[in-house]
A protein has these predicted regions:
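The feature primarily captures lumenal catalytic ectodomains
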Residues: 1-413, 420
Length: 424
């Protein structure tokens, strides 16, 4: 049975997180399978400005969409027309969309691969759809995952419509809202079992985002958590720099895995049942893919609000994290030592704030970011932003300057004079 420790979340966020972990979630032993002759597998045609959502999937011989070929987050049923498809005299399995995002690859991209483990001898190929017209080399940990599953040599990746003699569409074995099948976990267990043996083991690991290429532009203060966990005996691991085999062994052999919210905790799908997980929350938003992962892996998870939110932002940031009072309370309760004093100094927190404000302006200028999907969660968002406002009050209310041009503004000189007179 999974266990969740909500004590280190802000109260309203803790209540929302608890609600997600306790939502009805069905276990299905065997997902459904659709099978049809002369069906067409389509590439994904992007339909939104962000380039995230598209339409595609499979259509039957009569041109009707096969409902279970859609992908919850990013591939809607096909709309409109497409080019005259090529015909191939082959029986294939539709594997879904080969999404280029590691977290979504794990929770959406591979969810149909359970059918490969059924060992159907009549299948010629397994087919992934790419974006329409996309030329992409599948490499790195994406390719290694498929190699470890032993499916790589049977795969085809298509970027244009192709009609096959026969197409099998396995249902996704995992959906964040609704259900999962044990066959989904079989995929990850197979990959883990085929991974190269561990060359060394460590007791506790912290999976960090601090060396990601985009980190310096949108993520501020994350190094403080690297230092905090390292000083408390954790081995800091940078997943993007570690081969998948090695990463799997790190996770499976760890006593405790700590990491930052987002895609990184979803790597626990490679882990053992019932492992201990610590998630440092990087923003106000709850990553609603993680609760079902915690449930099906029976993880013993502690959430920590290590973030200092300023404005509403999506999961792409910018963010401030660090050794705030919530992390300090967690450290005290668990007899842990703090990070280097530099990481919780006034100067360091100010530098994080300045970086955040520059990043926010670069991304959004003077617009206020808000999407409809955030509205139902606004109570715990307001709670978070009130926390951030209090943390950085003197900068947000205009009492102290933080950008060079502020020193040219009369307002800030007035504030300085008021402080001098008050001290006198």
């Amino acid at each position: 049975m999974f266990e969740i420790d909500y004590r280190y979340l802000r109260p309203k966020k803790a209540a929302a997180m608890k609600k997600q972990h306790e939502a009805a979630y069905e276990r299905q032993e065997t997902p459904a399978v659709w099978q049809g002759k002369n069906a067409t597998i389509l590439p994904v045609r992007k339909i939104d400005a962000s380039g995230w959502v598209g339409c595609g999937g499979v259509v039957d011989a009569d041109g009707h969409c096969v409902d279970i070929s859609a992908v919850e987050c990013c591939v809607q049923p096909w709309k409109g027309t497409f080019a005259q498809p090529e015909y191939r005299d082959e029986k294939v399995v539709y594997c879904g969309y080969m999404i280029h995002h590691w977290g979504h690859f794990l929770v959406e991209g591979v969810t149909r691969l359970w059918y490969f483990l059924e060992n159907d001898p009549t299948v010629d190929k397994y087919v992934f759809a790419l974006d329409e017209g996309e030329i992409r080399q599948i490499k790195g940990n994406y390719r290694r995952f498929l190699e470890l599953l032993k499916i790589w040599d049977k795969l085809e990746f298509i970027n244009r419509p192709i009609t096959y003699r026969e197409v099998i569409v396995p249902e996704m074995a995992f959906r964040r809202w609704g259900y999962y099948s044990p066959k989904y976990l079989d995929i990850f267990n197979t990959v883990a079992e085929n991974a190269a043996p561990a060359t060394r083991t460590v007791g506790n690991i912290y999976m960090s985002r601090s060396l990601l290429p985009k980190h310096k532009d949108v993520e501020f203060g994350f190094e403080a958590l690297d230092d905090f966990f390292q000083k408390n005996g954790y081995t800091v691991v940078y997943p993007e720099r570690v081969p998948l085999d090695e990463m799997i062994q790190y996770i499976r052999n760890a006593d405790t895995v700590a990491t930052v919210s987002g895609s990184l905790p979803q790597n626990m799908l490679f882990g053992k049942q019932g492992q201990k997980l610590i998630i440092a929350e990087r923003c106000a938003i709850i990553d609603d893919w993680q609760p079902p992962v915690n449930r099906i892996k029976e993880l013993r998870t502690t959430y920590i609000d290590a973030n200092i939110p300023i404005y509403t932002v999506p999961m792409t940031g910018p963010f401030i994290m660090g050794y705030n009072d919530i992390v300090r309370r967690y450290a005290q309760d668990n007899a842990m030592v703090p990070p280097d004093a530099h990481f919780y100094s006034r100067k360091y927190f100010r530098s994080c704030f300045v970086g955040y404000m520059k990043s926010y302006q670069d991304l959004y200028r003077y617009r206020w970011f808000m999407e409809e999907y955030l509205l139902p969660e606004m109570d715990y968002h307001l709670e978070a932003y009130a926390y951030g406002e209090e943390f950085y009050r003197e900068y947000l209310n205009g009492s102290r300057p933080f950008r060079w041009h502020h020193y040219l503004e009369i307002h800030y000189w007035k504030q300085w004079l008021k402080r001098i007179l008050k001290k006198g």
